[in-house]
């Protein structure tokens, strides 16, 4: 450890050398019963999360990601079905479906979402036990995340790429701290950190920007080690690990660089913005301008559990200032602070903005709470505990009413969303095969058809998202789509290859072209009552006569 004189602040190289990180007697080492209670509370929270994930209604975004996993081995990911994100989520789902069977796709996706939560809990507990020497602080960290309403909606409850990167980012952070927060850096841990961080970024392109603070830190820490040693033992292994973890994205990019950019970058700019500009929703206006994004960020970050996290952070900073004689800034604090700031910055990148885009800084803010608390001396911790207890109580009051009611769903597994959707898909498939044979089903809501093992059109493989934006895809980029279709060309496509059935009613006005074709060609409408699906009140199955 780098020594420091009273009244001066210097950068320390190892958290564990500081008195605040030594094992101590009470109150820093709580009685065993308190630790058991904290672990029991975390387990109960995990069970409640499982119940909410299993019973949360199917969302539109899941039509995109689940279908990509199901069709991964049937069509090219980008040029075939028009996937517009980095490939890791499709690879994960495809691998899980291949391993666990070709049915109950949505249920498997939800189980993976729950696994991401368990991985996140494990990463937070590891960080807490290593850098704050306490189970209770780990329980608080888990509460700040799991009881935050921003994660108890589509963001954390569904099979999408919104939450899946979080455990990988936190484990990557933990491995980096363990690799460099020592007198002799560990190349193996640095490699592992780079690998896991690259895997996280492969789920969501915006997370690539979160790698920048790690790259800078790899050149600067540990500060007591010569630059050459930092390059060889931290920066180089981190880079090599990143290349290894990022291979799926790298290989796709090298295979067709222009097509990769067209799908990953351009599809989110011109086409999507073009669609929303042409179809404004006065009831639910989309957030596009920076002013509107700032207002949305204000509403999300300065309310609820996110606000409580910020209050706790500011309180710990104030205590650190009061105890500045024994408090020294440490590079892990600076790194995690930079990650939280970068996470806040990337929240403003996508357009239009949705609430799930404003969650990236929150896990790092929670880790920062842990590191700040761990940096305090014993009197400083005594000052912090009442504030932390109050924040914990308010967090439970805020989040528990959203989380706990789902527990009743555990008693009826047959009503879980993934099970219900698979059952409805099988019923739809039985009707189609009985009346119209094994022809393809035309639908912008493909999960039910895929759950019933019905063939679908690759043009509609990812649901409504690409079809509705297709008119704004530049002519020069349409060659990157093997099955390109716009709402205006749907009739000619279906005339050339008539569908055995048409399923509509979950995608609003985007279904209009399919419904018009079904009515014009005399398909027989069959009203359906689909449960556990978003916007499924007026579903129609049109059967060929």
Model-identified regions with their sequence ranges:
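Transmembrane-helix motifs of polytopic, lipid-linked glycan transferases
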Residues: 42-43, 111-132, 147, 152, ...
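Membrane-lumen/periplasm interface segments of specific transmembrane helices
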Residues: 234-279, 345, 349, 448
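Membrane-interface alpha helices of multi-pass inner-membrane proteins
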Residues: 142, 187-205, 211-216, 243, ...
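Short periplasmic/luminal acceptor-recognition loop of GT-C membrane glycosyltransferases, typified by
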Residues: 84, 195, 206-208, 304, ...
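Extracytoplasmic catalytic/substrate-binding loops of multi-pass membrane glycan-assembly enzymes
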Residues: 54-68, 80-95, 103-107, 257, ...
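Transmembrane-helix signature of polytopic, membrane-embedded enzymes
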Residues: 34-36, 121-147, 166-167, 334
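Membrane-interface transmembrane helices that cradle and orient dolichyl/undecaprenyl
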Residues: 132, 170-192, 219-225, 295, ...
């Amino acid at each position: 450890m780098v020594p420091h004189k009273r009244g001066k602040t210097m950068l320390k190289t190892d958290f564990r050398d500081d008195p605040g990180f030594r094992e101590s007697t009470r109150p820093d080492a709580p009685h065993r019963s308190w630790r058991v209670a904290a672990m029991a509370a975390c387990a109960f929270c995990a069970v409640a999360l499982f119940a909410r994930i299993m019973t949360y209604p199917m969302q539109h975004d899941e039509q995109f990601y689940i279908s990509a996993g199901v069709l991964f081995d049937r069509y090219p990911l980008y040029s075939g079905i028009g996937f517009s994100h980095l490939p890791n989520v499709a690879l994960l789902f495809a691998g899980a479906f291949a391993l666990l069977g070709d049915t109950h796709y949505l249920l498997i996706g939800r189980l993976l979402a729950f696994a991401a939560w368990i991985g996140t809990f494990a990463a937070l507990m590891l960080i807490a036990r290593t850098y704050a020497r306490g189970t209770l602080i780990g329980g608080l960290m888990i509460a700040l995340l799991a009881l935050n309403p921003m994660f108890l909606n589509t963001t954390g409850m569904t099979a999408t790429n919104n939450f899946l990167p979080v455990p990988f980012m936190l484990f990557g952070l933990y491995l980096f701290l363990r690799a460099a927060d020592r007198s002799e850096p560990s190349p193996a841990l640095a490699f592992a950190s780079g690998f896991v961080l690259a895997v996280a970024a492969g789920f969501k392109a915006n997370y690539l920007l979160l790698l920048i603070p790690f790259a800078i830190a790899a050149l600067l820490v540990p500060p007591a080690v010569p630059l050459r040693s930092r390059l060889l033992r931290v920066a180089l292994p981190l880079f090599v690990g990143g290349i290894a973890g990022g291979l799926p994205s790298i290989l796709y990019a090298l295979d067709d660089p222009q097509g990769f950019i067209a799908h990953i970058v351009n599809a989110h700019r011109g086409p999507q913005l073009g669609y929303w500009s042409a179809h404004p929703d006065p009831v639910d206006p989309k957030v596009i301008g920076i002013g509107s994004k700032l207002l949305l960020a204000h509403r999300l970050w300065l309310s609820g559990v996110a606000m409580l996290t910020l209050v706790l952070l500011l309180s710990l900073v104030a205590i650190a200032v009061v105890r500045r004689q024994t408090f020294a800034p440490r590079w892990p604090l600076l790194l995690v602070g930079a990650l939280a700031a970068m996470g806040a910055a990337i929240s403003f990148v996508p357009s239009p903005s949705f609430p799930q885009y404003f969650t990236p800084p929150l896990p790092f803010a929670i880790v920062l709470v842990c590191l700040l608390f761990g940096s305090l001396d014993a009197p400083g911790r005594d000052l912090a505990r009442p504030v932390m207890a109050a924040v914990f109580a308010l967090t439970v009051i805020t989040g528990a009413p959203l989380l706990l009611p789902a527990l009743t769903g555990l008693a009826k597994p047959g009503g879980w969303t993934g099970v219900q959707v698979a059952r409805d898909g099988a019923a739809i498939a039985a009707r189609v095969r009985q009346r119209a044979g094994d022809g393809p089903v035309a639908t912008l809501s493909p999960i039910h058809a895929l759950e019933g093992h019905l063939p679908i059109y690759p043009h509609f493989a990812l649901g409504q998202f690409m079809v509705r934006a297709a008119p704004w895809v530049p002519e020069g980029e349409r060659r990157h789509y093997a099955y390109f279709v716009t709402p205006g060309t749907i009739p000619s496509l279906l005339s050339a290859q008539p569908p055995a059935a048409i399923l509509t009613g979950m995608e609003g006005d985007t279904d209009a072209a399919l419904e018009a074709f079904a009515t014009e060609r005399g398909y027989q409408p069959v009203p359906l009552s689909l449960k556990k699906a978003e916007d499924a009140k007026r579903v129609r199955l049109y059967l060929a006569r």
